[in-house]
Amino acid sequence: LKKSLFLVVFLGLATLSICEEEKRETEEEEYNQGEDDKSEEKRFLSLIPHAINAVSTLVHHFG
């Protein structure tokens, strides 16, 4: 009986550990995706002044 109980507890803890690890990996992936989105947004926003300058130059040149 002790061996059976030990086995049940061990398997339960192993399953719980695996679930916690998967949850942690999922949260880490979501965090990294959010960081990637922020990085892309920063790159896009940094291009806006260059685009404005290019349009301004074209308008000034042809206008």
UniProtKB/Swiss-Prot annotation:
Report whether S-adenosyl-L-methionine shows up as a keyword of the record.
no
Cellular compartments annotated: Secreted
Signal peptide boundaries:
1-19
- The main location class comes to secreted
According to the UniProt record, one GO cellular component term is: extracellular region
Q: Does the keyword Cytoplasm apply?
A: no
Expression (tissue specificity) = Expressed by the skin glands.
Phenylalanine amide carried by residues = F62
Organism's domain of life? Eukaryota
Question: Pro-segment residues?
Answer: 20-41
Query: Alphabetically, which GO biological process terms does the record hold?
Result: defense response to bacterium
> Which keywords label this protein?
Amidation, Amphibian defense peptide, Antibiotic, Antimicrobial, Cleavage on pair of basic residues, Secreted, Signal
Family to which this protein belongs: Belongs to the frog skin active peptide (FSAP) family. Phylloseptin subfamily.
Purpose:
Has antimicrobial activity.
What name has this protein been given in UniProt?
Answer: Phylloseptin-Az1
Q: Which organism is it from?
A: Pithecopus azureus
